[in-house]
A protein has these predicted regions:
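Conserved donor-nucleotide/metal-binding helix-loop-beta segment in metal-dependent transferases, i.e.
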Residues: 73-98, 264, 271-274
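Membrane-embedded alpha-helical segments that form the functional core of polytopic membrane enzymes
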Residues: 194-250
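Membrane-interface alpha-helices at helix entry/exit sites of multi-pass transporters
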Residues: 249-257
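N-terminal glycine-rich phosphate-binding loop and ensuing alpha1 helix
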Residues: 2-56
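Cytosolic juxtamembrane amphipathic/interface segments immediately preceding
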Residues: 182-189
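Short beta-strand-to-loop acidic/aromatic patch adjacent to the donor-nucleotide binding site
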Residues: 59-73
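A feature for the membrane-embedded catalytic helix bundles of lipid/isoprenoid biosynthetic enzymes
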Residues: 98-181, 256-371
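Alpha-helical transmembrane segments of multipass membrane proteins
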Residues: 186, 206-210, 332-335
């Protein structure tokens, strides 16, 4: 069966008994804030599998049945690949975790076999007698196999590392993410929601902006540290949402515009504070340029950022745009603020944000949309 035909097949995800040796892993075992069986069900839903089983499913509708041992922690993208990848009709494939996939015109036979089989091995034997077995054609990197409860922490680490986005800056990837992922590991065990974390992060960032009204290094540094704290905590909302399957477009929009509101507030306060300190007009003009360019850039970049997509094409310009969109600039502000020179950062921003906007618009023109 071709990949296109596979996409038209109904996907059915069935949780089965674990492979021999993993029986002690309870289906109620909590992994990153969710019971294991609930995590599997939500991952299947996110991957596009049917939410329920219909007893009188018409036989002419093909179905791809994925039989997943309950000790396997799956990524939605991996489950989606099992659903959409090419697979011959009535061919059984099995991986080392005893995950089984079969494409069939009568899925009820497979489902009934799974219901009565006492173990994954017994189910495998029964299905192998009915279907020809072929080699496993899919990747295995998208799932983590629990063999004992001691594996839970490693499984959580594996899940957390998968949350790093495509467009991470160097400092974000190697410093901020380490902190935010450590916080998220603990936060997912609580009832805090992604939107609540977005509000906390934005509040801290906005609280830091007024410190830049002063020209004193100590106050500017305090503001920069709060700005950095905002940036670190800003990663937690999306991490919680993806780990607990709470992602929503509304939440992504709130996060995106909350970030940009903080940036606008910081740039504006630097401009106002520098104007007070120097009795000059140019800081306000520079801040106005930075604010307008930031808002315009946000409008251009909105869809790609909210959907976490790479820039269209693979040109050096597209890669440069992704690099400039990162928030590593915060560390420059941190250093300059330690010496009371936040105004220097404002000057750089007044030149940099229009250049970023021009590059985004140029790529938008060349590729239709920057996505």
């Amino acid at each position: 069966m071709s990949a296109a035909e596979a996409q038209r097949a109904v996907g059915i995800l069935v949780v089965i008994a674990p492979a021999d040796g993993a029986e002690k892993v309870s289906p109620a075992q909590v992994v990153a804030g969710l019971p294991l069986v609930q995590r599997i069900a939500l991952a299947g839903k996110a991957a596009g599998y049917a939410e329920g089983l219909v007893g009188d499913r018409p036989e002419q509708i093909p179905a791809r049945v994925v039989l997943l041992p309950r000790n396997v922690v799956p990524q939605p993208a991996w489950l989606r690949s099992l659903l959409e990848g090419a697979l011959e009709r009535d061919c059984l494939v099995v991986d080392s975790s005893m995950t089984m996939v079969v494409e069939t015109a009568d899925p009820s036979l497979v489902i009934k076999a799974a219901a009565r089989a006492p173990s994954a091995a017994a189910l495998h034997e029964e299905l192998r007698a009915r279907y020809a077995q072929g080699p496993w054609p899919f990747e295995t990197s998208g799932r983590f196999v629990l063999t004992a409860t001691e594996d839970v922490r490693r499984a959580e680490t594996w899940l957390l590392r998968s949350l790093i986005k495509q467009r991470e800056g160097f400092m974000s990837r190697h410093f901020e993410r380490r902190i935010s992922l450590g916080l998220t590991r603990r936060l997912v065990r609580t009832s805090i929601t992604p939107n609540a974390m977005t509000a906390v992060s934005a509040a801290i960032g906005l609280a830091g902006a007024p410190f830049f009204l002063s020209s004193e290094p100590r106050w500017q540094l305090a503001g920069a540290l709060l700005f950095l704290t905002h940036s670190i905590l800003d990663g937690c909302d999306g991490e919680i949402a993806r780990l607990k399957f709470l992602s929503s477009r509304r939440g992504a929009i709130l996060d995106f515009w909350g970030d940009n509101l903080v940036h606008v507030a910081v740039f504006a306060c630097i401009g106002i504070g520098t104007t007070w300190a120097t009795a000059s007009f140019w800081p306000l003009a520079a801040a106005a340029v930075a604010v307008v360019s930031t808002v315009a850039s946000a409008a251009v970049m909105f869809r790609r950022t909210v959907d976490d997509r790479a820039s269209a094409g693979s040109t050096s310009s597209a890669r440069l745009l992704d690099a400039l969109a990162s928030r590593d600039f915060i560390y420059l502000l941190l250093v300059l603020s330690a010496f009371g020179k936040a105004a220097w950062f404002l000057v750089a921003t007044a030149f940099g944000t229009p250049a970023f906007l021009a590059l985004a618009l140029w790529l938008d023109y060349r590729h239709g949309r920057v996505r």
